[in-house]
Amino acid sequence: MHESSLLKVQSFVENYVNFKSSLPIKVLDVGSMIVQKDSPSFKSIFQDKGTQYIGLDVESGLNVDYVPEDPYSWSEIPDETIDVIVSGQAFEHIPYFWITAAEMSRVLKPSGLLCLIFPSAGAVHRYPFDCWRFYPDSAQALTQYIGLELVEADTEQSGFRKRVRTDWKETLVIARKIAAHDEVTSTRLRSIVASSPTTEFVYHRVDKGPAIAQYEKTVKVSIVVYGLRYSLIPIARKFVKKIIRYDKRKNKIAKNH
């Protein structure tokens, strides 16, 4: 769990989740497994607030309460019974994430809230797959597809003045289920879930072929050109800018005297 994700969900909870309800709030954390023992989880945000926290993942492990028989069909969870759904760093690892999103929409109560966090950049990190990257427009398309209202969507940019890592450039999505789904929407969501492949997704390594090899040969430059482009030329530009700034200051001082 990235520290940035934990802080994003903390902000989501403080700004959107109302804990004054007489009934315990049901929270579903999709992709909840703690892989590294000392890693934090979203559970820490909810555990002291009288909520019913359910950690869902595709296999048993630390911080996992529920492993669905079918990862794309949570038949054990009734329709519209969850108040809040959170998920961080999970969707990029789900081959058919839109089916998972449809199930989220199905189990979410009317006025229920959804908070998703996923990367828009970063190195490949298979667990066991790494299939996708997401942007605010991805959030717009996905929430419309599953019948939710998009409330917030933003992709974090890198910054030197931040105390958390930003190299993943995480996209934060907050959405709301305005009302109970009508029969048309419910039927469509069920059809999305029913479209789940009958066979498990299996990763097969695919190496470079002749097309990629030809492209790389075409765009490759010599070490001399590379050095000029990415080393000497930038240095020269900075040097010229410094000279220009120096001349401007010198002229300004001369005018004042």
What are the roles of these predicted feature ranges?
Residues 237-257:
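Low-complexity, charge- and small-residue-enriched intrinsically disordered regions
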Residues 15-21, 42-46, 147:
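Alpha-helix termini
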Residues 16-23, 161-165:
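Intrinsically disordered, low-complexity coil segments
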